[in-house]
Amino acid sequence: MKKRMLDVLMLVIGAFFFALAVNLFAIPNDLGEGGVTGITLILYYLFQWSPGVTNFILNAFLLLIGYKFLDGKTTVYTIIAVAANSLFLHLTHGWSIPSDELIINTIFAGVFAGVGIGMIIRVGGTTAGSAILARIANKYLDWNISYALLFFDLIVVFSSYFIIGAEKMMFTIVMLYIGTKVMDFIIEGLNTKKAITVISENKSEIAEQVNTLMDRGVTILSGKGNYTGQSKEILYIVINKQELSMLKKIIRSCDKKAFVIVHDVRDVFGEGFVDISK
């Protein structure tokens, strides 16, 4: 229950940040956006329709069509995110900051949007619209969520050329790129993963200490030295970046002659890391 309350809080805060990106930075500078929000802005520039109301109607329609591609939790979280975002778009409409620097506003629009959407996606929700398409692409095509979202968003952005012009469209693309990078940071965090390969005569002692002291699993692989022709068992360990110094200390204490390779890892799914179903 506590985790769900924290998740809902993250959804609401994320929706607020995204609404600020639109009302504080995008609309005052005639910038576009991707997905449903981009369509909402086009309709606002053309007909002065309320972004909050339009956003809610369009996303509700897409949810009715695409909810079957989302699991139960994601659907509920998406409904909360869409409702909160539409509400905040309405409440913050007309807010402004005293800045006429288009480049600065573009950067901050990307940062706020990236933080907002990143928080929503991190807890398992979406902002509906193109985010639903990105989730589907991630689930069935194994596309990176952030870049799938960027792809679908760009389709709407290029369409906005006829409304906001070439210069503002290019600034919008910059905003989306910044948002994608910030979103990646929010979703992945600073917990860069490392995969460690260890070849040692004291492999059993190292593996036992990693299990006991670090509470990490160790996989034993079979290998063979080309020069010696001897068969060897190789340890393969996946850890968080901040655990690397402790692992090095364990290896040094067990075998100062151990051969160790440290690999950078982009994503790790499974027990002890990220649930692969998310």
UniProtKB/Swiss-Prot annotation:
InterPro entries in the record: DUF2179, N-reg_PII/ATP_PRibTrfase_C, UPF0750_membrane, YitT
Keyword Membrane belongs to the record: yes
Localization, UniProt: Cell membrane
Keyword vocabulary terms for this entry: Cell membrane, Membrane, Transmembrane, Transmembrane helix
Main location: membrane
Membrane topology: Multi-pass membrane protein
One term under GO cellular component: plasma membrane
Record keyword Transmembrane helix present: yes
Coiled-coil segments: none
Stored PANTHER family: UPF0750 MEMBRANE PROTEIN YITT-RELATED, UPF0750 MEMBRANE PROTEIN YXKD
Protein family: Belongs to the UPF0750 family.
Protein name: UPF0750 membrane protein YxkD
Organism, as annotated: Bacillus subtilis (strain 168)
Name of the encoding gene: yxkD
